[in-house]
Design a protein with these regions (language model features):
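Conserved catalytic-loop aspartate of Hanks-type protein kinases
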Residues: 58
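Conserved activation segment of eukaryotic-like protein kinases, specifically the C-terminal portion
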Residues: 34-47
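Conserved C-terminal C-lobe helix
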Residues: 104-118
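Catalytic-loop of the protein kinase fold
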Residues: 1-12
Length: 167
């Protein structure tokens, strides 16, 4: 578990491949300390509530980064209270159509992928980074869609690379 995935902890190489940095905060699942620090705006709801930080928590954090990239701004900017932040995370999936550009929201595969990353209930998120990549609504399917549509670019591996780093 990385435990602090956020946009400033993801670096993109010239080749277009993404690298998650600040691995010093990562811990084995069986060696989790009782108190951990995190960046609240990127932490999953269950982490903010003091529950266990799991690989699914990292997926939610990565989903928030993806939304930030697609929207061009952090999804939780300007929130002043813990309660507002938590409520905003819980309602995020329903607010995506208002937050994201139309060319993103019209892509059902991409929207389902995002929702599978950020579901407020961890049990409704992808079970693992591998699943987030390989299942029907996963990153690999979206990548194939880009290739078929002639929309793949030299940076088309970013999402998949992040997921591979979480595996």
């Amino acid at each position: 578990v990385h435990g602090d995935i956020k946009s400033s902890n993801i670096m993109v190489k010239r080749t277009g491949n993404a690298k998650i940095i600040d691995i010093g905060s990562a811990l084995a699942l069986d060696d989790m300390p009782p108190n951990r620090t995190c960046t609240p705006s990127y932490a999953a709801p269950e982490v903010l509530e003091g529950r266990e930080n799991t690989p699914r928590s990292d997926l939610a954090s990565l989903g928030y980064v993806l939304i930030e990239m697609l929207a061009g701004k952090p999804p939780f900017a300007g929130l002043q209270s813990y309660r507002d932040l938590l409520e905003s995370k819980r309602s995020l999936a329903h607010r995506l159509p208002q937050m994201l550009p139309a060319d993103v929201t019209c892509n059902e595969l991409l929207m389902n992928f995002i929702r599978g990353m950020i579901a407020s209930d961890p049990a409704r998120r992808f079970p693992s980074a591998e699943d987030a990549d390989l299942v029907k609504e996963g990153a690999a399917s979206f990548h194939r869609q880009l290739i078929v549509g002639g929309l793949a670019s030299e940076y088309d591996n970013e999402i998949r690379a992040w997921l591979e780093l979480l595996e």
